[in-house]
Structure formats: structure tokens, C-alpha cells
């Protein structure tokens, strides 16, 4: 059975609207949309073992970025977590005989090398969410600083209203699933 899965790597400066865009798409697709970040497992480890308070200030962003780098270098943990998450979800969809139904996995990833690896190994589509004021903000780590140092398949301008972003989410879903 052919899979209807689209893996979409989403990137953008902190505060650019990545999660808002993904949630708008999820509102339209329901259970056929999942979201995972390459730092989700890193955050779980930081919460449980490093007593991280869950705040996303500059110091915490640097800590999480460094921890992700260590886990990536040690055993490719963040990438393998995304692959495992995708495989488990696809198995669930297959169990209900809906694997061929259009479905989307949004993956938040910042590092250009990792983004290109998702494209190469998983056939992912890449999206950059752009918001002018977010791109001018100070960054505390290499991942946030290198957001614009990558070529993306699609760019979504998020300098308008939430309704504007919702319309762009509709357009994007129609485009990637070839709906006219």
C-alpha cells in the first residue's frame, strides 16, 4: 500500500510563527497531521535529568542547542527519534488501513546539514516561515543564527494577520497534496 505521507521540515527564526503555521495546518487535517521537533526528545532529557525549568530564554536555548549537538554526535539521537516517530505513526495509520490517505508530519529542525539530510534520506519538503521582526532578534546559538543559511522549497511570509497565515496554510496544503 502506497503511503500518503509528506514530511515537511519547518524552520524559521524564534517567534516567526512556525508552530502557528503547523497548528493551522493541523486544524485543517485533523488526525492526519502530526508535529515533532528534533529537540522534543532533547527537551524531555533536559527536564528529567538536568532539572531544566522549561523556559525558552536565551540561556536555555543555548543549553538545549548544545545538548542536541552532543546527542547528535554521540549516537544520532535527534534524527533517529524523528525516524522512529514517523515509523510508529505510519504503523498506526496502516493498522487502520488509512496509510494511503494524505497525511503530513511537520518536523521542526534548525541546522542546515540536518535539514538537507531529511531531504536526502526521507524525501522531505522544506519550508521557511519568515517574519521580519523575528529575524532581527538576537540569537544565542548556532542553530538559531543559521536559519537563513539554507535553501528551502517553500517560503511562507508571516508578516500579516493570523487569517492571512491561515489562508497560506490552505494554499500550502493544496499545493503539496496537488489539490486544485
Model-predicted regions and their roles:
Residues 21:
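Hydrophobic positions on the alpha1 helix immediately C-terminal to the Walker A/P-loop
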